[in-house]
Amino acid sequence: MTEERRQAIRSDYDSDPERFRTGQRATESYSRVGDVHEPVAARLQAEHLEPVLDLGCGEGRLLKLLRARGAAVVGLDNSPTMLAAVPEPKVLSDATAIPFPDGHFGAVAALYMLYHLPDPRAVLAESRRVLRTDGLFVTCAPSRYDNPELADLLPESPPNTFDSENGPDMVREFFADIEVERWDAPLLDLPNTEALLSWLRGYGVSGEDARRVAAQVATPLTLTKRGALIWAYGRSH
């Protein structure tokens, strides 16, 4: 059987950092429950697994939450623009070649980043390598069936290389004990066309396509958000 064609999401954090920031602001403004960073920070703190490596840390949302709780955290990102907002210690590096020795970290977080890789397994292998045998790995991704209210209007594209459908099995190739927390609920309330356009911008929809979608959608609009948070302990081999 031929494997389904998938594509990595193009990274634009240096060429268009405001797109990323707009997406974060839209989530903060319109989500009913916020994002995963708070519960992830709370669990990592509760389990006392340090130091923590925040892979693809962006502008440090998870990292800053953990440091506010007194945790030792290192941020790693391959975007100089994103990393400029992150306090030390931080590392400018590719997540497929993590510049730390084997078993160095008590926890590794890779939130909303594995779908940027043509082969996410390279990052999963590196995460396993730098994690202690009793350590904890956590990642997350949206579903390919996210935002069903707009499914017929958004530009079509192949599934991402890592999503909530294929992600758990891929993580299980490297880690033995997997927990999957899925979400599937009406979680994002967009009150008007301006909010919809802002969310579309953050979602990576081009200006022309965003205006086309907005012209066909009545607001207020509630979007169903689907995805998964994946926790992994230990090693599978």
Q: What annotation goes with each model-predicted range?
A:
Residues P51-A97:
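Class I SAM-dependent methyltransferase SAM/SAH-binding core
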Residues A109:
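A conserved beta-strand element that flanks and buttresses the S-adenosyl-L-methionine
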Residues Y112-H116:
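Short catalytic micro-motifs in class I SAM-dependent methyltransferases
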